Design a protein with these regions (language model features):
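C-terminal catalytic domain of Rieske-type non-heme iron oxygenases
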Residues: 30-259
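Extended catalytic-interface subdomain
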Residues: 19-28, 71
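Active-site-proximal cofactor/substrate-binding loop regions of enzyme domains
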Residues: 1-22
């Protein structure tokens, strides 16, 4: 009898099984979650075809450099074939947000839901990315990465696709959704190819036309420092930002700070 020695104690973590996956809250300080697992409403919408989790493998990259993409409007054209017309970032609390629209070489087409690709993309914390997408189809994209050691992560992708007719999915809808998910996966794989080849860049030099990279890096610090410091980092980064020379996505962002 007696207390269990600290060295022999087994730690426990908050675990939820939802959306076809297992989610674990990890806090090295041992604290309870200070934000909830986001609700993916489209998962339960019967007019959407639920996708499958694509495991993309392990990546030798610090997750901070993956999150950089939320501010990297400049890569959308050369990497993904987008012609960005409007773009903005917003940072608030545990969310980092990107809103953008423009043409795209693979995810829009004649007769689709939208002539341009519109994405409303949110990071919920440092590793859960979701995006409402309107292009050839209306869809809901999920990209998750899990750190497994310093500078190494595992990555997953999923896509829910709304039927073009707005009704319950037919067999043809399921086939079309699977094809569209593959197109989405291949578009994301273009980022994966860059990450797998690049050297670490943990202390980069930023210039005004780069966008809100520095704000994104400051936002990210709240997750890799004591929780008590989070408010200090948020004070330095919260707000909406538009890259120099770019048009804001939303009208109320016209007066937003130029990144």
């Amino acid at each position: 009898d007696g207390a269990i020695p600290a060295a022999a104690a087994v730690k426990s973590w908050k675990v939820e099984e939802r959306y076809g996956a297992i989610w674990v809250w990890f806090d090295p300080e041992g604290g309870e979650p200070d934000y909830d697992l986001p609700t993916f409403g489209d998962w339960h919408d019967e007019t959407y075809v639920n996708g499958q989790w694509d495991y993309l493998g392990e990546l030798n990259q610090h997750p901070m450099e993956v999150v950089d993409n939320i501010a990297d409007y400049g890569h959308l054209s050369p990497i993904h074939g987008s012609t960005v017309a409007r773009f903005e970032n917003e940072f608030k609390g545990h969310n980092a947000i990107q809103r953008q629209c423009g043409g795209h070489r693979t995810l829009v087409g004649e007769g689709g839901a939208s002539a341009d690709l519109h994405t409303d993309t949110w990071y919920h914390g440092p590793a859960i990315l979701v995006s409402k997408v309107s292009g050839m189809f209306n869809s809901f994209m999920m990209i998750m990465h899990t750190p497994i050691e310093d500078g190494r992560i595992k990555v997953w992708h999923n896509l829910l696709v709304k039927t073009a007719h707005g009704g319950l999915p037919t067999k043809a809808d399921e086939i079309a959704a699977k094809q569209y998910q593959e197109a989405s996966r291949l578009a994301f794989a273009q980022d994966f190819e860059v990450w797998s080849q690049k050297a670490p860049c943990l202390n980069p030099l930023f210039i005004p036309s780069d966008g809100a990279f520095l704000k994104a890096r400051i936002w990210y610090k709240q997750f890799y420092n004591p929780r008590a410091k989070a408010a200090d980092y948020l004070e330095q980064c919260e707000g909406k930002y538009v890259p120099r020379g770019m048009v804001a996505y939303t009208a109320d962002s016209e007066e937003a700070a130029v990144a």
